[in-house]
């Protein structure tokens, strides 16, 4: 989970100076994601820094239904019923409870993570390319407030055929490269509301921390 937190929670500000072709592709992608009543997603992530010798990988999955979501990253889990959000951290056996709308711009809701480009960036259409034998659009994102964030570029790979997000790469100022790859996406996936119910009894020995 820490990899994705590092990759996504540092995004902020408002967009300007957009590339028309890139913007049209991203607008279509946002509309597709927001048009889903529910969806299921699986992904992999990697953080690499040659200077420090860092090379860490994690996998995750998430279910989204309206404003509710359940997401797991490595050994950690986030559950939100749209009102409250619980982050279960197994390393220190703690559960952190917050209001679902608190720090909304830093939400780990998969739907919001998959539309994070909607604000905070200039964008530029780079080229068409191939990714795993599939034609993709390559779009660069550049933060408006570059001096306030730890990265300088995010590269998006969007399927030319389906207009789905396939991969995102973040390049940090210290040489760290973070990669997020979508491995499965199921539209309007069947998911019961019980998936988004948190029960402290299922986590004996854990400490509940309320903000």
Residue ranges of model-derived segments:
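An acidic-aromatic
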Residues: 59-108, 178-179
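Short, solvent-exposed helix-to-loop capping segments enriched in aromatics
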Residues: 33, 105-120
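A short, amphipathic edge element
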Residues: 23-24, 114-126
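Gly/Pro-enriched, hydrophobic low-complexity segments
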Residues: 125-128, 132-207
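Short, exposed beta-strand/loop patches in secreted or surface proteins that constitute
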Residues: 32, 60-63, 77-78, 123-130
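N-terminal leader/targeting segments and the immediate start of mature chains
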Residues: 11-54, 67, 202-211
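Positively charged n-region of N-terminal signal peptides that target proteins for export
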Residues: 1-4, 18
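Sec-dependent N-terminal signal peptides
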Residues: 3-12
């Amino acid at each position: 989970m820490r990899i994705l937190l590092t990759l996504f929670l540092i995004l902020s500000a408002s967009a300007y100076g957009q590339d028309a072709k890139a913007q049209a592709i991203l607008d279509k992608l946002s509309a597709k994601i927001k048009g889903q009543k529910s969806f299921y997603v699986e992904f992999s992530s990697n953080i690499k820094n040659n200077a420090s010798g860092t090379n860490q990988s994690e996998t995750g999955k998430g279910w989204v239904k309206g404003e509710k979501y359940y997401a797991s990253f490595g050994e950690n889990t986030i559950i939100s019923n749209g009102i409250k959000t619980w982050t279960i951290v197994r390393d220190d056996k703690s559960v952190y409870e917050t209001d679902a709308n608190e720090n909304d711009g830093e939400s780990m809701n998969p739907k919001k993570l998959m539309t994070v480009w909607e604000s905070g960036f200039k964008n530029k259409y780079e080229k068409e390319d191939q990714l795993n034998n599939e034609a993709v659009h390559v779009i660069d994102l550049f933060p408006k407030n570059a001096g306030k964030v730890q990265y300088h570029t995010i590269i998006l790979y969007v399927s030319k055929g389906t207009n789905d997000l396939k991969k995102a790469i973040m390049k940090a100022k210290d040489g760290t490269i973070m990669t997020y790859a979508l491995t499965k996406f199921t539209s309007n996936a069947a998911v019961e509301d019980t998936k988004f119910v948190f029960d402290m009894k299922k986590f004996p020995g854990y400490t509940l921390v309320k903000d």
